[in-house]
């Protein structure tokens, strides 16, 4: 579970644990205190033979836990407790922690694919899985500048505030975006394995977490004026009609630059990961996830 942020959240978590125990789940509670704890705790639970891992937190916490499980086979259940909660929404889970806990005993296991990012960091090859979204460029830069305390206090409003600040400061560096050998350029790209971005927005063509491949939205313009227009288009869901916006799909995505001074960040499930060049691919049959019966109907 992500560290308790308030008295209200503490009460919700303890009530959810009580619900699980009433349902016969012998739950051992572990709290995260710093980045990386979710991955470490999930790895320890997997290697110790735990039957089920229940992750309570936002998409970043879920991402850490997934990377602690895979390539193991321990099933994962989710209690939504973050800002965007894309993973929970994609699975059809209630938005309330306690209600989601009540549903766990009725959920079924499903095997789903995951996205995987591969990149170099100081000469070391790194890999990380992601469930829903990767962002390259502008949104990753926002995350790199975001004040953690403000995020905890304000939630999604902190992202909006930082986006407004950065739209006038960002350098809008172009990079090469290649989808299955089709190359183009972009200043901001979203690579989705989900139907949602930032919790409720829909940028790319419809995609579901159990589908193979990626659905991508590219923004190719530069400067504050163009990006403010993009923001208006995204909110009104007319962005795909704007000049410099492209919708693509592919099974392997590569983002790179031929300019050595280019420094473009990318994020995975809302958490800063690294800098380009980076390659995204899909790993089929990668994770066992618990979801309601309604999730099976979206697979048809």
Segments predicted by a language model, with ranges:
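ATP/NTP phosphate-donor binding region
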Residues: 1-53, 63, 98-102, 296, ...
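Catalytic core of DAGKc-family lipid kinases
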Residues: 21-23, 32, 71-75, 79-188
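N-terminal glycine-rich "phosphate-gripper" loop used for MgATP/nucleotide binding
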Residues: 55-59
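Short Gly/Thr/Asp-enriched flexible loops that form oxyanion-binding sites at enzyme active sites
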Residues: 61-74
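Glycine-rich phosphate/pyrophosphate-binding beta-alpha loops
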Residues: 135, 139, 190-204, 272
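Gly/Ser/Thr-rich active-site loops/lids in small-molecule metabolic enzymes
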Residues: 150-158, 202-226
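A generic structural signal for short beta-strands and their flanking turns/coil linkers
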Residues: 171-173, 185-187, 210-214, 249-251
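ATP/nucleoside-binding phosphotransfer catalytic cores, i.e., glycine-rich phosphate-binding loops
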Residues: 183, 208, 218-300
């Amino acid at each position: 579970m992500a560290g308790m942020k308030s008295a209200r959240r503490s009460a919700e978590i303890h009530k959810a644990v009580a619900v699980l125990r009433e349902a016969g789940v012998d739950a051992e509670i572990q709290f995260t205190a710093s980045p990386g704890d979710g991955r470490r705790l999930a790895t320890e639970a997997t290697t110790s033979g735990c039957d089920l891992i229940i992750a309570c937190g936002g998409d970043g916490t879920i991402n850490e836990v997934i990377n602690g499980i895979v390539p193991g086979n321990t099933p994962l259940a989710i209690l939504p407790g973050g800002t965007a909660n894309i993973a929970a929404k994609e699975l059809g889970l209630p938005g309330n922690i306690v209600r989601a806990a009540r549903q766990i005993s009725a959920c079924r296991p499903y095997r789903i694919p995951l996205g995987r990012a591969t990149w170099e960091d100081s000469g070391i090859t790194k890999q990380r899985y992601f469930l829903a979204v990767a962002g390259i460029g502008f949104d990753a830069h926002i995350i790199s500048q975001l004040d953690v305390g403000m995020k905890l206090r304000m939630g999604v409003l902190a992202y909006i505030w930082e986006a407004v600040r950065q739209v006038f400061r960002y350098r809008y560096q172009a990079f090469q975006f290649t989808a299955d050998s089709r190359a183009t350029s972009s200043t901001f790209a979203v690579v989705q394995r989900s139907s949602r971005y930032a919790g409720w927005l829909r940028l790319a063509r419809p995609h579901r977490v159990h589908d193979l491949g990626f659905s991508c939205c590219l923004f190719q313009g530069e400067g504050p004026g163009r990006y403010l227009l993009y923001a208006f288009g995204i909110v009104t869901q007319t962005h795909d009609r704007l000049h410099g916006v492209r919708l693509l799909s592919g099974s392997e995505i590569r983002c790179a630059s031929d300019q050595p001074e280019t420094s473009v960040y990318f994020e995975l499930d809302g958490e800063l990961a690294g800098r380009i060049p980076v390659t995204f691919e899909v790993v089929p049959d990668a994770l066992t996830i618990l979801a309601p019966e309604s999730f099976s109907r979206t697979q048809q």
